[in-house]
Regions:
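Extended hydrophobic/Leu-rich segments
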Residues: 14, 55, 75-77, 100, ...
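Short, charged interaction patches at domain edges and termini
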Residues: 1-13, 60-68, 106-152
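Small/polar-rich, solvent-exposed N-terminal microdomains that initiate assembly or binding
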Residues: 1-64, 149-152
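Broad gene-expression machinery/nucleic-acid interaction feature
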Residues: 50-52, 70-74, 128-132
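Short, hydrophobic/π-rich interface segment
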Residues: 84-106
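Active-site-adjacent structural patch at catalytic or cofactor/ligand-binding sites
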Residues: 55-81
């Protein structure tokens, strides 16, 4: 499990670099750089946390040959101006996705798959998006299966 947290930490560094120049609206009328959190964005006191990005290893699947991990990146913005928030959200999705996919291999062990999904949802004063990234642990999970597949 430590390795998955290390992967989340690597993603956090990339996202922090990506959003550090943004000045986004908050519920209390200020502007702020989005906070980047490992784990889900807490639902209590959103006015103190939003804008925020959360990084969660949301699921995994072990097969005979590989270990797959899905990491969901959630973005929550306060909506002061719907058009501006909508445009900002799409820019954040595009930039974060590009930067995370570009690296390819993380920690010499996790390879990101090029297939990813994203979606946006608006609810009340907040706009939320999620980006789902899929990773495969590179051949450190089961090496004995190679002999079995190759008939040795």
């Amino acid at each position: 499990m430590k390795k998955i947290y290390d992967l989340e930490t690597e993603l956090k560094l990339i996202i922090e670099e990506n959003v550090r120049y943004l000045k986004l609206d908050t519920a209390n009328g200020d502007v702020a750089v989005p906070q980047v959190i490992i784990g889900p964005i807490p639902s209590e006191n959103p006015e103190e946390l939003v804008p925020a990005v959360g990084i969660v290893a949301s699921s995994g699947k072990n097969t005979l040959e590989s270990k797959q991990i899905s990491i969901e990146t959630s973005i929550v913005l306060y909506i002061k101006d719907t058009g501006k928030a909508y445009k900002t959200m799409y820019e954040m999705i595009e930039n974060i996705s590009k930067d995370i996919l570009e690296k390819g291999i993380y920690l010499n062990e996790f390879e990101i798959c090029t297939d990813m999904e994203w979606k946006i949802d608006c609810a009340g004063l907040y706009m939320a998006a999620s980006i789902l990234f899929n990773f495969i642990r590179i051949k450190t999970y089961r090496t004995d299966v190679d002999d079995w597949i190759n008939g040795k």
